[in-house]
Design a protein with these regions (language model features):
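Low-acidity, Ser/Thr- and Arg-rich intrinsically disordered low-complexity segments
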Residues: 238-248, 252-263, 267-270
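Enzyme catalytic cores with a strong preference for nitrogen-chemistry domains
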Residues: 1-250
Length: 270
């Protein structure tokens, strides 16, 4: 925090689908760039550790093991550093697999938030692999990436008045987004880890959706979309990044660039 402001960033990754260690290195590049710019909250895309487009390989035990190992390595790397990092990972829990946001800070894995609304129409069929976060009627304990932590509907106190809520992609596109309830629970920053593909006119609609939800919840909204390197199947992704905060009338939107470092960063007042 700096005079009541916190610097946040939405980040795209130069990843290789399935290769957890490669993604680990990509996150480190963006993380180090974020530290240089004094970013305190860094948000990466949905399933950023493995890639969103793994399809039936989400059933592979090796993928889940390597994903958890990559999260453990990230947690170890940022230990003691003044930054909060959000990464997306598939998390197994009681014989079900959840599409999750993993919140990591200087002390380790701070908590895990599962995606509630699974996209299962047209080009999406997430219910084939994942269970819904609505399974969690209350917060549960979990051992993950070497840490005893919590999984479920969690808001995170980042200190100095900054309260973080998390949702994932489709959660924003439904009539009653989880972020609305998170705001009612005190969240003044919402992070969205997303893998929204592209088609004609969708970019503008998505941009307005982020801005409108920020206004509706009277909070900052940090949106990180899947990298262009996810475009390995019949879906096209554009590294869509947005940060909206109506409190200071700021809206930033960037598309993919060749640097793939820190693509969107802004001070917000929580």
């Amino acid at each position: 925090m700096n005079y009541g402001f916190i610097k946040t960033a939405a980040s795209s990754l130069k990843l290789k689908v399935l290769f957890g260690h490669n993604t680990f290195n990509a996150v480190l590049i963006n993380h180090n760039s974020a530290l240089e710019k004094n970013v305190k909250l860094l948000v990466t895309p949905e399933l950023s550790v493995t890639g969103y487009t793994c399809a039936d390989l989400f059933f592979a035990r090796t993928l889940l093991i390597e994903s958890e190992r990559a999260v453990a390595e990230l947690a170890d790397y940022i230990k003691g550093k003044d930054i909060v990092l959000l990464v997306g990972a598939p998390v197994p829990f009681f014989n079900k697999l959840y599409n999750c946001a993993v919140v990591i800070d200087k002390d380790g894995v701070k908590g895990i938030v599962p995606k509630k609304h699974l996209a299962n129409y047209n080009e999406f069929y997430e219910k084939r692999w994942f269970a819904s976060g609505f399974d969690f009627k209350e917060v549960q304990s979990i051992s993950y990436a070497g840490f005893d932590t919590k999984i479920g509907n969690i808001v995170f106190d980042l200190g100095s008045g900054a309260i973080l809520g998390v949702e994932l992609c489709e959660d924003l596109w439904v009539p009653n987004p989880p972020s609305s309830f998170l705001a009612l629970c005190g969240a003044n920053i919402i992070a969205n880890l997303s893998a929204s593909d592209e088609y004609v006119s969708k970019a503008q609609y998505r941009r307005e959706l982020v801005a409108n939800q920020s206004a509706r919840c009277v909070c900052a909204y940090v949106y990180s979309g899947a990298s262009v390197f996810e475009s390995t199947t019949d879906l096209v992704f554009s590294s869509a990044l947005s940060i909206a905060s109506l409190i200071i009338d700021v809206l930033k939107l960037t598309s993919a660039t060749l640097s793939f470092k820190l693509l969107a960063a802004v001070f917000i007042n929580p």
